Amino acid sequence: METVITTTIIASAILLAVAALGTALGFAILGGKFLESSARQPELASSLQIKMFIVAGLLDAISMIAVGIALLFIFANPFIDLLK
């Protein structure tokens, strides 16, 4: 039983790390492309900014979902019931 709990906590930590890394890379690429495109066409900067914030919200949702799944696995582990 302790093995299942330990493995679940390690998997949750890896899940959180990968989600944070993916979100950070996504924000870096998004910000770079936004600055590049608004420098090329300054008249489209306002419409590009709106689209950037929409995509930023979707990027943030990825890490929030990962945190929710990790908390589910840590505090309400569904795999422990399989051992009983």
From Swiss-Prot:
Plastid recorded as keyword: no
Subcellular location: Cell inner membrane
Record-annotated membrane-spanning stretches: 9-29, 54-74
Principal location listed in the UniProt entry: membrane
InterPro entries: ATP_synth_csu_bac/chlpt, ATP_synth_F0_csu, ATP_synth_F0_csu_DDCD_BS, ATP_synth_F0_csu_sf, ATPase_proteolipid_c-like_dom, F/V-ATP_Csub_sf
Membrane topology annotation: Multi-pass membrane protein
Listed GO MF terms: lipid binding; proton-transporting ATP synthase activity, rotational mechanism
Record-annotated site: Reversibly protonated during proton transport: D60
Keywords: ATP synthesis, Cell inner membrane, Cell membrane, CF(0), Hydrogen ion transport, Ion transport, Lipid-binding, Membrane, Transmembrane, Transmembrane helix, Transport
Gene Ontology annotations for the cellular component aspect, listed alphabetically: plasma membrane; proton-transporting ATP synthase complex; proton-transporting two-sector ATPase complex, proton-transporting domain
Keyword Ion transport: yes
UniProt cross-references to Pfam families, sorted A to Z: ATP-synt_C
Superkingdom, taxonomy of origin: Bacteria
Family of the protein in this entry: Belongs to the ATPase C chain family.
Subunit structure: F-type ATPases have 2 components, F(1) - the catalytic core - and F(0) - the membrane proton channel. F(1) has five subunits: alpha(3), beta(3), gamma(1), delta(1), epsilon(1). F(0) has three main subunits: a(1), b(2) and c(10-14). The alpha and beta chains form an alternating ring which encloses part of the gamma chain. F(1) is attached to F(0) by a central stalk formed by the gamma and epsilon chains, while a peripheral stalk is formed by the delta and b chains.
UniProt function note: F(1)F(0) ATP synthase produces ATP from ADP in the presence of a proton or sodium gradient. F-type ATPases consist of two structural domains, F(1) containing the extramembraneous catalytic core and F(0) containing the membrane proton channel, linked together by a central stalk and a peripheral stalk. During catalysis, ATP synthesis in the catalytic domain of F(1) is coupled via a rotary mechanism of the central stalk subunits to proton translocation.
Protein's UniProt name: ATP synthase subunit c
Organism name: Pasteurella multocida (strain Pm70)
Lineage: Bacteria, Pseudomonadati, Pseudomonadota, Gammaproteobacteria, Pasteurellales
